[in-house]
Amino acid sequence: DSEYVNNVGIIQQNPKVVAINNAIEIDVTGQVCADSIGNKIYSGVGGQMDFIRGASLSEGGKPIIALNSTTKNGISKIVPFLKKGAGVVTTRAHVHYVVTEYGIANLYGKTIEERIKLLIGIAHPAHRDQLNQSSKLVLA
């Protein structure tokens, strides 16, 4: 029953919960889109926020967003801004760890500037220069 399985109060009672969730894209501040591509719904929200919150409240828990750094067509999934119309499933305030094939970014408690640097550091190397340039607009 999803009312029990996805219950944050139940999840947090278990120590060392590791919640691994996927993302369609993530912006350089840590906002996660996991249900849409722009304004086109791709999937349901599911229990992503339940498990992110439950793991973060679990003693020794680790909430993780894991994604490939690029789409199959080589487009970066780490972006300066989410696509117009994209839904924010997990807010930047709830994101702790983001993992790509290029490393791990621990965003918990970090400033926007620190988050930008950390997320660009785990982006595909071919996109890092462009992300550095585009991310200046985030801070403008």
Residue ranges of predicted features:
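Conserved phosphate- and dinucleotide-binding cores of soluble alpha/beta proteins
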Residues: 1-140
